[in-house]
Amino acid sequence: MRKVVLYIATSMDGYIAKPNDDLSFLSIVQKEGEDYGYKDFIDTVDTVILGRKTYDWIVKQVAFPHADKHAYIITRTKRPDEGKTVFYSGNLKDLINKLKKEHGKNIFCDGGAEIVNELLKDNLIDEFIISVIPVLLGNGTKLFNDDRPETKLDFVSAKSFDTGLVQLHYKRKV
């Protein structure tokens, strides 16, 4: 069965964005030639799940980087699909359960926080690869909401980089 893998960056104090969906803090760890394992990770997935706000932010910056994969943009407002990119307004749990049963590579959850926390409520995230950025933001969008079930994890690995980024990899205990 395919796995849902959350691959995301967060500040030391648990925020994935500053107020107004500002992701500028990510530039703290930008280093030429360093992708923090992203290319290796992205080769293991063929499907991407992300929220509409995250999608809109990405396409304002660059061309959608996942156009070659099956992408499901979770939205409350139906929009026309664009190639392999589907704007999905149905039940998220049903979609994930359907995708997990299909043949293919893993499923990349790219955020945002609403999608992550909805998936956590139903124990639908199998692995967590979280890159911790060395900054305390103080406010913004929290990665994990307070009102969610406890989720026990098994340690897979931890990597540290000279930029100060630490990448943590865990699997959900079954």
Region spans (language model):
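Enzymes that bind and transform nitrogen-containing heteroaromatic metabolites
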Residues: 1-174
